[in-house]
């Protein structure tokens, strides 16, 4: 959602480079993820032995909702959020617990909602009014600008960033 809109500009600047895009969900196993590829973009800490990483952006998470499904969104407190169906991404099992801990709310009282493998599906579910989502800010920019979704609070840093990662054997490869 954030990469493809930028590819036109990249190709204009670098017409000699051809990029093949494959989507995978990886869990810090950069070696297997890069097995058939020269470089990958992944989220993490940026520290993978045997690999070079270049930070692209720091991830910030936003609590978002559909204003049609939550008309009183302007009056929400972190404790109020726990009373609603909280949508989850399978790859981030503790995201909501961490968010509540940061806001001084006992996460054991939260109302866990459906789980989604893809963040794109979670965004669609939030837009459809199924619940409240905790989503990387960069992935919901269009929905926020259009008013389809609203942010309930200021974004918080997740502790993760997105990186361009490649094996050290490719460090002298010109396109990288």
Model-derived regions: residue spans:
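Residues that form or flank phosphate/diphosphate-binding pockets in enzymes
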Residues: 2, 73, 174
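Generic beta-structure capping elements
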Residues: 22-24, 42-44, 66, 91, ...
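A late-sequence structural motif
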Residues: 155-176
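C-terminal regulatory
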Residues: 30-34, 46-130, 135, 139-159
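Short hydrophobic beta-strand segments
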Residues: 1, 86-87, 164
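Central regulatory/effector-binding core of bacterial HTH transcription factors
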Residues: 1-48
């Amino acid at each position: 959602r954030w990469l493809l809109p930028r590819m036109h500009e990249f190709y204009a600047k670098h017409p000699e480079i051809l990029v093949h895009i494959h989507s995978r969900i990886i869990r810090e196993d950069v070696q297997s993820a890069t097995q058939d590829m020269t470089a990958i973009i992944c989220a993490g800490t940026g520290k993978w032995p045997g690999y070079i990483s270049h930070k692209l952006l720091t991830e910030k998470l936003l609590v978002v909702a559909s204003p049609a499904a939550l008309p009183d969104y302007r009056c929400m407190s972190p404790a109020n959020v726990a009373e609603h169906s909280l949508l989850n991404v399978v790859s981030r099992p503790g995201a909501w617990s961490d968010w509540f801990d940061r806001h001084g709310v006992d996460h054991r009282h939260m109302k866990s909602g459906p789980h989604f493998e893809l963040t794109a599906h979670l965004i669609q579910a939030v837009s459809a009014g199924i619940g409240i989502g905790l989503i990387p800010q960069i992935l919901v920019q269009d929905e926020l600008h259009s008013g389809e979704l609203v942010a309930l609070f200021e974004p918080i840093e997740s502790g993760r960033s997105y990186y361009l990662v490649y094996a050290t054997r490719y460090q002298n490869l010109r396109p990288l």
